[in-house]
């Protein structure tokens, strides 16, 4: 239908006198401008006090006909537009009917002339009919915009992951030998309001003792993940890698420090279904982070082997910018963003020596984490319309879990870590880490 809230005589009108329907008939109305800006202009000044009439249903059909709006599917990209539909009585509309062209023309075959008739007068008493009107144009985010936000936010969640010494290398104070190799597998589930992501990876590392108390090493990680978008029919595939260098110091009295530097890249490839098509998006971002972790293991009971280990950690991460076009020509730009996460936590556990004189342990842990950074900003534009979004802003969340290390041989160990994360908008988020280390 054609609508014009400024010149209402140009607006298309529907007239229904009666219907054979035994049950309620529901009809969609659809505006079809050449571009979204024309759609906005079509309803530019409608309101409760200035409704736009589009249909009149006479009394015989009044309880058999209803109308609803369909989203604007022509060239829509960032937003969907819905007309708010209501009904009015004759008393509410009688002073406004003169603004519309309710006449129609009929050809007289005898005279070959057209005669005008008032359509409202054809269907009985127009005072008893129902007048269907539009009172507002409601704008909502399109599936494309929702998916672009979810893809960006899930990539941020992956990029700002906070690694830890124990998850990476286990209990290195138990490990003898000047050189070591290790491999770690990890699986994470990270849920937010816009997405539910599962990702896993493998990390390989090696290090050596450059002094009696320090180890220097490097590690290479490869990750793959999938995110289901909430509220829309879409998914995101994520592939990433990173190279890490670390310098770990541990003192005999229980103190330790672990410094890390990490650089990597990840690739986001997403798609979402709209009313008319499948829209895809493809882009890459970089990651650079620096971290410092420290703590002290306090032996609570020498004979029982119970210990307490308070910990503190900070990580700064820079997530790179990206610029690309979606398959339906939405221009997308993500600006570089900075994350600064702090963690305070503790471990409480027990150490024991097995029959072969090898140390093992098990413990529970809990942490509070806070994001001090301002997150990452993005801008999406199409057809002269722009939408700005932001993710990764300040917030606090928590984790709790169980962990332990067990000797496999004289110079080999296995470490397992199970962790549940909650608060700060997280939903159904948890992580599993398992690593094996060999020393020489």
Where are these regions (language model features)?
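Extracellular beta-strand/loop-rich repeat segments of large surface/secreted proteins
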Residues: 1-51, 59
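Membrane translocator/pore-forming domains, dominated by Gram-negative outer-membrane beta-barrels
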Residues: 2, 177-180, 184-440
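A structural detector for beta-sheet-dominated domains
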Residues: 2-4, 16-17, 30-32, 58, ...
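Interface/linker segment at the passenger-translocator junction
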Residues: 5, 51-56, 71-190
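Polar, low-hydrophobicity, Gly/Ser/Thr/Asn/Asp-enriched low-complexity stretches outside signal peptides
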Residues: 10, 23, 36, 64-68, ...
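Intrinsic-disorder/low-complexity loop/linker signature
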Residues: 37, 112, 384-385
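Short, surface-exposed loop/helix-turn segments at secondary-structure junctions
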Residues: 41-56, 63-66, 380-386
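Charged/polar, low-hydrophobicity segments characteristic of intrinsically disordered regions
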Residues: 61-75, 217
């Amino acid at each position: 239908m054609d609508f014009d809230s400024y010149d209402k005589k140009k607006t298309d009108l529907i007239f229904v006198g009666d219907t054979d329907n035994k049950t309620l008939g529901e009809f969609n109305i659809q505006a079809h401008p050449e571009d979204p800006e024309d759609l906005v202009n079509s309803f530019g000044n409608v309101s409760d006090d200035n409704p736009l009439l589009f249909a009149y249903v006479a009394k015989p059909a009044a309880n058999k006909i209803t109308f609803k709006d369909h989203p604007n599917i022509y060239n829509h990209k960032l937003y969907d537009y819905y007309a708010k539909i209501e009904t009015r009585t004759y008393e509410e509309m009688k002073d406004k009917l003169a603004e519309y062209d309710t006449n129609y023309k009929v050809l007289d075959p005898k005279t070959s002339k057209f005669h005008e008739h008032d359509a409202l007068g054809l269907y009985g008493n127009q005072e008893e009919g129902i007048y269907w009107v539009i009172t507002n144009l409601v704008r909502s985010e399109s599936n494309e915009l929702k998916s672009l936000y979810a893809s960006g936010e899930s990539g941020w969640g992956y990029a700002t992951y906070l690694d830890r010494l124990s998850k990476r290398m286990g209990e290195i104070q138990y490990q003898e030998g000047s050189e070591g190799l290790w491999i770690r597998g990890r699986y994470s589930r990270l849920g937010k309001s816009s997405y539910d992501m599962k990702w896993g990876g493998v990390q390989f590392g090696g290090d050596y003792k450059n002094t009696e108390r320090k180890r220097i090493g490097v590690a290479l990680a490869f990750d793959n993940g999938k995110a289901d978008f909430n509220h829309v029919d879409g998914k995101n595939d994520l592939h990433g890698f990173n190279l890490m260098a670390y310098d770990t110091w541990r003192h005999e009295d229980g103190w330790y420090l672990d410094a890390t530097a990490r650089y990597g890249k990840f690739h986001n490839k997403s798609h979402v279904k709209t009313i008319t098509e499948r829209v895809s998006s493809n882009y890459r971002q970089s990651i650079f982070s620096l971290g410092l972790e420290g703590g002290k293991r306090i032996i609570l009971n020498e004979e029982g082997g119970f210990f307490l280990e308070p910990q503190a950690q900070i990580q700064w991460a820079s997530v790179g910018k990206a610029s690309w076009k979606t398959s339906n020509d939405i221009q997308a730009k993500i600006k570089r963003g900075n994350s600064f996460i702090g963690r305070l936590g503790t471990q409480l556990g027990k150490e024991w020596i097995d029959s072969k004189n090898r140390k093992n342990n098990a413990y529970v842990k809990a942490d509070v984490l806070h994001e001090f950074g301002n997150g990452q900003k993005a801008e999406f534009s199409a057809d002269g319309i722009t939408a700005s979004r932001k993710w990764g802003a300040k917030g606090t969340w928590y984790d709790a879990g169980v962990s332990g290390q067990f000797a496999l041989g004289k110079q080999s160990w296995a470490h397992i870590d199970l962790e549940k994360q909650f608060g700060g908008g997280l939903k159904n988020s948890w992580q599993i880490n398992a690593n094996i280390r060999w020393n020489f």
